[in-house]
Protein backbone atom coordinates (compact mmCIF):
# COMPACT_ATOMS: atom_id res chain seq x y z
CA UNK A 1 0.00 0.00 0.00
CA UNK A 2 1.30 3.45 -0.93
CA UNK A 3 1.85 6.03 1.78
CA UNK A 4 0.27 9.45 2.21
CA UNK A 5 2.59 12.01 3.78
CA UNK A 6 0.52 14.35 5.95
CA UNK A 7 1.57 17.88 6.88
CA UNK A 8 -0.29 19.49 9.79
CA UNK A 9 0.37 23.18 9.11
CA UNK A 10 -1.93 24.88 11.61
CA UNK A 11 -2.85 28.46 10.67
CA UNK A 12 -1.19 29.59 7.44
CA UNK A 13 -1.81 32.34 4.87
CA UNK A 14 -3.48 31.26 1.65
CA UNK A 15 -0.62 32.44 -0.57
CA UNK A 16 1.99 30.64 1.55
CA UNK A 17 0.01 27.40 1.37
CA UNK A 18 -0.50 27.88 -2.36
CA UNK A 19 3.24 28.24 -2.93
CA UNK A 20 3.87 25.12 -0.86
CA UNK A 21 1.34 23.24 -2.98
CA UNK A 22 3.07 24.32 -6.18
CA UNK A 23 6.46 23.22 -4.86
CA UNK A 24 5.17 19.85 -3.70
CA UNK A 25 3.26 19.35 -6.97
CA UNK A 26 6.49 19.80 -8.93
CA UNK A 27 8.17 17.25 -6.69
CA UNK A 28 5.24 14.85 -7.04
CA UNK A 29 5.31 15.22 -10.81
CA UNK A 30 9.02 14.38 -10.96
CA UNK A 31 8.65 11.43 -8.61
CA UNK A 32 10.71 12.94 -5.79
CA UNK A 33 7.83 12.47 -3.35
CA UNK A 34 4.71 10.36 -3.08
CA UNK A 35 1.13 11.44 -2.50
CA UNK A 36 0.96 14.24 0.06
CA UNK A 37 -1.78 15.94 2.09
CA UNK A 38 -1.72 19.42 3.61
CA UNK A 39 -4.11 20.07 6.51
CA UNK A 40 -4.50 23.63 7.73
CA UNK A 41 -6.66 26.63 8.56
CA UNK A 42 -6.55 29.97 6.74
CA UNK A 43 -7.05 33.47 8.16
CA UNK A 44 -10.14 35.28 6.76
CA UNK A 45 -9.69 34.99 2.99
CA UNK A 46 -11.94 35.13 -0.06
CA UNK A 47 -10.67 33.12 -3.01
CA UNK A 48 -11.88 33.35 -6.58
CA UNK A 49 -11.80 30.24 -8.75
CA UNK A 50 -11.62 30.20 -12.52
CA UNK A 51 -15.42 30.54 -12.84
CA UNK A 52 -15.84 33.31 -10.27
CA UNK A 53 -17.49 36.61 -11.13
CA UNK A 54 -16.70 39.90 -9.36
CA UNK A 55 -20.33 40.43 -8.39
CA UNK A 56 -20.16 37.32 -6.21
CA UNK A 57 -18.24 39.43 -3.68
CA UNK A 58 -21.07 41.49 -2.21
CA UNK A 59 -19.03 43.34 0.43
CA UNK A 60 -17.29 46.61 -0.40
CA UNK A 61 -13.49 46.89 -0.25
CA UNK A 62 -13.91 49.01 2.89
CA UNK A 63 -16.00 46.31 4.56
CA UNK A 64 -13.44 43.67 3.68
CA UNK A 65 -10.61 45.79 5.01
CA UNK A 66 -12.48 46.46 8.26
CA UNK A 67 -12.85 42.73 8.82
CA UNK A 68 -9.27 41.96 7.82
CA UNK A 69 -10.35 39.85 4.85
CA UNK A 70 -7.97 39.46 1.92
CA UNK A 71 -9.05 38.53 -1.61
CA UNK A 72 -6.98 36.14 -3.74
CA UNK A 73 -7.45 35.14 -7.38
CA UNK A 74 -6.74 31.41 -7.34
CA UNK A 75 -6.03 28.95 -10.14
CA UNK A 76 -8.41 26.32 -8.74
CA UNK A 77 -11.66 25.33 -10.36
CA UNK A 78 -14.98 26.67 -9.14
CA UNK A 79 -16.27 30.06 -8.11
CA UNK A 80 -15.92 32.15 -4.95
CA UNK A 81 -15.48 30.79 -1.44
CA UNK A 82 -14.57 32.01 2.02
CA UNK A 83 -11.91 30.65 4.35
CA UNK A 84 -11.54 31.41 8.05
CA UNK A 85 -10.19 29.89 11.25
CA UNK A 86 -12.39 27.02 12.34
CA UNK A 87 -12.55 25.63 8.82
CA UNK A 88 -10.52 22.47 8.12
CA UNK A 89 -8.80 22.83 4.75
CA UNK A 90 -7.30 19.79 3.03
CA UNK A 91 -5.04 20.02 -0.03
CA UNK A 92 -4.21 16.60 -1.52
CA UNK A 93 -1.16 16.54 -3.81
CA UNK A 94 -1.95 13.33 -5.69
CA UNK A 95 -0.66 11.74 -8.88
CA UNK A 96 -4.06 11.19 -10.42
CA UNK A 97 -2.93 8.32 -12.67
CA UNK A 98 -2.60 6.24 -9.50
CA UNK A 99 -6.21 6.96 -8.58
CA UNK A 100 -8.09 6.33 -11.80
CA UNK A 101 -7.03 9.33 -13.93
CA UNK A 102 -10.55 10.78 -13.84
CA UNK A 103 -11.04 14.22 -12.28
CA UNK A 104 -14.77 13.70 -11.77
CA UNK A 105 -14.16 10.43 -9.96
CA UNK A 106 -11.47 12.10 -7.85
CA UNK A 107 -13.85 14.90 -6.81
CA UNK A 108 -16.51 12.32 -5.94
CA UNK A 109 -13.88 10.64 -3.77
CA UNK A 110 -13.24 13.89 -1.91
CA UNK A 111 -16.97 14.32 -1.40
CA UNK A 112 -17.30 10.75 -0.15
CA UNK A 113 -14.47 11.26 2.33
CA UNK A 114 -16.38 14.15 3.90
CA UNK A 115 -19.70 12.30 3.80
CA UNK A 116 -18.09 9.51 5.83
CA UNK A 117 -16.65 11.97 8.36
CA UNK A 118 -20.08 13.54 8.79
CA UNK A 119 -21.68 10.12 9.20
CA UNK A 120 -19.33 9.47 12.10
CA UNK A 121 -20.96 12.43 13.85
CA UNK A 122 -24.48 11.32 13.01
CA UNK A 123 -24.89 13.89 10.23
CA UNK A 124 -26.21 12.89 6.81
CA UNK A 125 -24.02 14.47 4.15
CA UNK A 126 -25.34 14.60 0.61
CA UNK A 127 -24.42 15.48 -2.94
CA UNK A 128 -26.60 17.83 -5.00
CA UNK A 129 -27.00 17.08 -8.69
CA UNK A 130 -25.08 19.55 -10.84
CA UNK A 131 -23.18 21.03 -7.90
CA UNK A 132 -19.87 20.23 -6.25
CA UNK A 133 -19.32 19.84 -2.52
CA UNK A 134 -21.17 18.29 0.40
CA UNK A 135 -24.53 19.43 1.71
CA UNK A 136 -26.85 18.69 4.62
CA UNK A 137 -30.55 18.99 5.40
CA UNK A 138 -31.68 17.80 2.01
CA UNK A 139 -29.28 20.08 0.18
CA UNK A 140 -30.45 23.21 1.99
CA UNK A 141 -27.04 24.09 3.44
CA UNK A 142 -23.47 23.54 2.29
CA UNK A 143 -20.98 22.25 4.83
CA UNK A 144 -17.98 21.55 2.59
CA UNK A 145 -16.71 23.34 -0.52
CA UNK A 146 -14.49 21.63 -3.09
CA UNK A 147 -12.33 23.17 -5.80
CA UNK A 148 -9.36 21.46 -7.43
CA UNK A 149 -6.77 21.89 -10.12
CA UNK A 150 -5.10 19.21 -12.23
CA UNK A 151 -1.70 20.07 -13.68
CA UNK A 152 -0.55 19.14 -17.17
CA UNK A 153 1.48 16.36 -15.58
CA UNK A 154 -1.60 14.99 -13.82
CA UNK A 155 -0.96 16.17 -10.25
CA UNK A 156 -3.78 17.57 -8.12
CA UNK A 157 -3.68 20.73 -6.02
CA UNK A 158 -6.23 22.65 -3.95
CA UNK A 159 -8.98 20.51 -2.46
CA UNK A 160 -11.70 20.85 0.15
CA UNK A 161 -12.77 23.15 2.98
CA UNK A 162 -14.93 21.60 5.70
CA UNK A 163 -16.73 23.98 8.05
CA UNK A 164 -16.04 22.75 11.58
CA UNK A 165 -16.66 25.93 13.59
CA UNK A 166 -15.83 29.05 11.54
CA UNK A 167 -17.59 32.40 11.94
CA UNK A 168 -20.28 31.80 9.35
CA UNK A 169 -21.06 35.51 9.10
CA UNK A 170 -18.05 35.75 6.81
CA UNK A 171 -20.01 33.93 4.13
CA UNK A 172 -22.37 36.93 4.02
CA UNK A 173 -19.55 38.80 2.27
CA UNK A 174 -19.95 36.61 -0.82
CA UNK A 175 -22.37 34.52 -2.83
CA UNK A 176 -20.85 31.17 -1.81
CA UNK A 177 -19.82 29.20 -4.89
CA UNK A 178 -22.08 31.50 -6.90
CA UNK A 179 -25.18 29.90 -5.37
CA UNK A 180 -27.62 32.39 -3.86
CA UNK A 181 -30.55 30.15 -2.87
CA UNK A 182 -28.84 27.79 -0.40
CA UNK A 183 -27.32 28.36 3.01
CA UNK A 184 -24.01 27.52 4.68
CA UNK A 185 -23.56 25.53 7.86
CA UNK A 186 -20.92 23.87 10.03
CA UNK A 187 -20.38 20.86 12.24
CA UNK A 188 -20.81 23.13 15.26
CA UNK A 189 -24.22 24.32 14.06
CA UNK A 190 -25.45 20.84 13.16
CA UNK A 191 -24.21 19.23 16.39
CA UNK A 192 -24.86 22.10 18.78
CA UNK A 193 -21.17 22.17 19.71
CA UNK A 194 -17.87 22.03 17.86
CA UNK A 195 -15.90 18.78 17.83
CA UNK A 196 -12.13 19.16 18.31
CA UNK A 197 -10.41 20.21 15.09
CA UNK A 198 -7.68 17.58 15.59
CA UNK A 199 -10.32 14.87 15.90
CA UNK A 200 -12.04 15.95 12.68
CA UNK A 201 -8.66 16.08 10.92
CA UNK A 202 -7.80 12.55 12.04
CA UNK A 203 -11.15 11.26 10.82
CA UNK A 204 -10.70 12.99 7.47
CA UNK A 205 -7.23 11.47 7.04
CA UNK A 206 -8.62 8.02 7.77
CA UNK A 207 -11.48 8.53 5.34
CA UNK A 208 -9.26 9.79 2.52
CA UNK A 209 -6.85 6.90 3.03
CA UNK A 210 -9.67 4.35 2.95
CA UNK A 211 -11.10 5.77 -0.26
CA UNK A 212 -7.80 6.25 -2.10
CA UNK A 213 -6.09 3.13 -0.68
CA UNK A 214 -3.27 4.93 1.12
CA UNK A 215 -1.50 4.59 4.47
CA UNK A 216 -0.90 7.86 6.37
CA UNK A 217 2.48 8.91 7.74
CA UNK A 218 3.14 12.25 9.38
CA UNK A 219 5.70 14.52 7.74
CA UNK A 220 8.84 15.15 9.76
CA UNK A 221 8.58 18.91 9.17
Curated annotation (Swiss-Prot):
Keywords for the protein's UniProt record, in alphabetical order: Acyltransferase, Cytoplasm, Transferase
Catalytic activity: octanoyl-[ACP] + L-lysyl-[protein] = N(6)-octanoyl-L-lysyl-[protein] + holo-[ACP] + H(+)
Pfam families from the UniProt entry: LplA-B_cat
Compartments (UniProt record): Cytoplasm
GO CC, any one term: cytoplasm
Pathway field: Protein modification; protein lipoylation via endogenous pathway; protein N(6)-(lipoyl)lysine from octanoyl-[acyl-carrier-protein]: step 1/2
Note: In the reaction, the free carboxyl group of octanoic acid is attached via an amide linkage to the epsilon-amino group of a specific lysine residue of lipoyl domains of lipoate-dependent enzymes.
Protein family: Belongs to the LipB family.
Function: Catalyzes the transfer of endogenously produced octanoic acid from octanoyl-acyl-carrier-protein onto the lipoyl domains of lipoate-dependent enzymes. Lipoyl-ACP can also act as a substrate although octanoyl-ACP is likely to be the physiological substrate.
PANTHER family the record matches: LIPOYLTRANSFERASE 2, MITOCHONDRIAL-RELATED (PTHR10993:SF7), OCTANOYLTRANSFERASE (PTHR10993)
Entry protein name: Octanoyltransferase
Organism of derivation: Chloroflexus aggregans (strain MD-66 / DSM 9485)
